[in-house]
Amino acid sequence: FFQLPVNGDKKKMKWVMTMNINPGCWFGGSATEYFVGDFDGKNFTCPDAHDVKWLDWGKDHYATVTFSNTGDRVLGITWMSNWQYANLTPFKQNRGANGLPRELKLYEKNGKYYISEDVAPEVYALRKDTKDLADASVADAKDLKGVAANMEGAFEIEADVTPDANGIAGIEISNNKRERTMIYFDMKQGKVVMDRTESGLTDFGKQSVPHDIELAWDKQLAAEGKEPARITNSINYKNDFALATWAPLSLCEDGKKTYHVDIFVDKSSVELFVDGGRIAMTNLVFPVAPYENVKLYTQGGKAEFKNLKVHRLGL
């Protein structure tokens, strides 16, 4: 529970209540949602409490906590996992790791308030080496094979992406075992998507056991002749781990044509930030060998990729 200025204006403050829920995630299992409103010292009021707002649009962002003694900034950190499969993931030493620290800010759009959750600026000190890549106009695909080789699977990709107005433009990260994670803009659907169905080890998701409450929801939907919500809300659903998550591009500024993406890749996670954290998306991945290849690709038109950089990270 904390205060944030709206659009950086300290004369216009709002209170934010975060809530870690299990189940209830848009894609199944656990997640963090938030509510923005006013607090008089006793009562918290939120005028749009029925609108679900996710702090992160991936499936592995839970147990978010914020810190004291950070000046006038609000910094948070999350646990990267989901209780649907937290005890099934192929970790040997732990049950998941923390995500990168993030700075939370509040912005207003069309009369409603939303949190942007960008990586904290201190994280950039992890950059060790930078490769500046040439701008690319892509009509099909451009391979950057081995661009992240010798980075031990820990690197950051930055780019300004201008998709075709009705097409798909994406960045694929992969290894030489044909395992890949795809991040793409689907402009016709108005979504940014992260697909981990072929990211590496995924079959453990077949053993996932949803929460009893979620199973009750499934039963109710089945009686109506419908599939479980976690399946219909996901894209390319294979099992409770092998799927794609997505976020609406309406969270970004209206009329946007170019989107800034910042992708942090580690040995078992991919964290995506779009337009300064207006969209954040965190997902676990378990490739059997480190990702080291990048491919720019499009469908249904040409896309521009500019200011493209790959940073080796000291993680």
Q: Where does each model-flagged region fall?
A:
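Structural motif
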Residues: 26-36
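Hydrophobic core segments of beta-strands in well-ordered, beta-rich domains
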Residues: 2, 11-23, 73-80
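Short catalytic/ligand-binding loop motif for oxyanion handling, primarily in non-cytosolic enzymes
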Residues: 24-27, 84-86
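Outer-membrane beta-barrel proteins
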Residues: 5-7
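Short, well-ordered alpha-helical packing segments
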Residues: 2, 16-18, 34, 63, ...
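Beta-rich accessory regions
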Residues: 10, 38-51, 55-59, 63-315
